């Protein structure tokens, strides 16, 4: 077994990488543990969502894809919009350094400005490009956000049932995942349960609407009451340590 890492190709870095690989291989041969046990355990656990997805692939091979309705991972079953396909084709014509090169860490300035303009036009906000930080997927965004607004030992509230990866990202930031049960009849966010879950260690509350996995769309009244509760809680706290509201919105555009 070998370990490879992404390093600039200087003699010092190459030597360091080779030494690290040799040390790892030596320890591996001796049966020594060289990896994070907590993360290994999480990776070794079976994911029911992935199991269902794999089962769906098997059934498609057996009886035909048109006879299987797979609701596991949420893969699209329709073609991409024409505008998306055309944009991808156009991107392939960019100069090589733009197509394959690195972007600034927060993302391309023109892309950030376009996102800010879209949000302002649709939601009446007043963002600027500098307020937008681009990531590859929501997982990276939530990981960065949690690392930015929490400290080890803090607590982060999630609305149960919730997307399982929230717990992984929260605990990886050194925080405790605290569950606030949704309304059992409507799956609406229960403001009362969120209020009960708030402690001196609460650093953030994560919500997503439409919700994964329930599909519930939080009402304006529910969100307004949640905002008021958090404002009241923050009024009693140190102004430098407010409870942050993190809104995960991968399904914002999918409301039926």
What is each model feature region?
Residues 245-246:
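Residue-level marker for buried hydrophobic side chains located in beta-strands
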């Amino acid at each position: 077994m070998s370990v490879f890492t992404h390093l600039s190709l200087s003699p010092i870095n190459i030597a360091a990488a080779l030494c690290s690989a040799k040390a790892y291989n030596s320890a591996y041969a001796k049966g020594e543990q060289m990896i994070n046990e907590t993360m290994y355990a999480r990776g070794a656990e079976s994911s029911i969502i992935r199991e269902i997805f794999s089962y769906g692939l098997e059934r498609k091979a057996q009886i035909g894809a048109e006879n299987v309705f797979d609701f596991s991972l949420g893969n699209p079953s329709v073609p991409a919009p024409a505008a998306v396909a055309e944009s991808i084709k156009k991107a392939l014509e960019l100069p090589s350094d733009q197509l394959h090169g690195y972007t600034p860490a927060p993302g391309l300035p023109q892309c950030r400005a376009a996102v800010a303009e879209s949000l302002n036009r649709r939601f009446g906000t007043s963002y600027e490009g500098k307020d937008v930080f681009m990531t590859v997927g929501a997982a990276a965004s939530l990981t960065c956000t949690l690392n930015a607004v929490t400290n080890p030992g803090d607590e982060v509230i999630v609305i149960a049932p919730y997307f399982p990866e929230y717990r992984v990202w929260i605990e990886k930031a050194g925080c405790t995942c605290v569950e606030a049960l949704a309304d059992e009849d409507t799956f609406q966010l229960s403001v009362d349960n969120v209020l009960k879950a708030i402690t001196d260690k609460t650093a953030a509350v994560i919500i997503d609407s439409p919700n994964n996995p329930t599909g519930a769309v939080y009402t304006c009244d529910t969100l307004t009451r949640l905002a008021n509760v958090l404002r009241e809680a923050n009024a009693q706290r140190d102004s430098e340590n407010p409870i942050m509201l993190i809104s995960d919105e991968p399904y914002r555009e999918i409301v039926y």
